[in-house]
Amino acid sequence: MFEDMDPYVILLIFVAVILAVSLVAAFLPRMMKLDMRQIHLMVALSAGIFLGILFFMLLPETFEEAHEGGAGAMDPVLWIVGGFLVVLFVDVIVKRMHMNKCACEECDDKDHLHEVTSLTAFIGLAIHAVVDGLVIALAIGHGEALAAVVLVGISLHKFADVFALSSIFTLTKIEKKKTLVFMIAFILITPVAAILSMPVVDILEDFAIFIPLAVATGIFMYVGIYSLLPEAFHERRDSLKSLAIVVAGIVAIALIAILLGDAHGH
């Protein structure tokens, strides 16, 4: 797919694809004019896609790269836990600071809780987006085959990232202009991080790519399980629908992963 291409041309293709995917994902929830129940079902779909990407793409790719790089069995596990704990720490601090500022009667208000959830999800996914940029630069430096797989994988979970974040923001009463600024900033993080990482790829050519992959996996795990799943089941009357949609999202990504695996194998 990328044979004999200049690395910076490949990078431009990555940036163009990721920006296009991100813009579509950002505006879909707003264009569909959904009510609260439907938005929560969309978050359920995002959660399913997140979990599918986590279990069928990020985890296998992380352990495969660790094995090929000669790392020990526990090395990727430690980095995954590290990524998870970093976002957990940030989440706890942000919520603590935010709750200290609010009036007691506001803290249990649904709109207020949605605002806090959107903020912590943004922070977690922003950290993940920076790591994605580094992974893109390293993948391009490691060869065309890995770059193609990473492009498909990151495009898929970038769609899930942006769609989920945009859906969560629609649940809040934050001003549209402010949420638009947040979304534009988030969409630009990965391309900017990739561009800034490219000049140092040669310096990092012996850098173990499984490390940023593992950190990204830990962050993805936290946001998917801790932020999105609870929000997906927020409407108890739709719990069975949400469950079915989460499972459908997981199965869809599993099928895509199988197809990509077959294509990569050939």
Regions from the language model: what does each represent?
Residues 1-266:
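Intrinsically disordered, metal-sensing/regulatory segments
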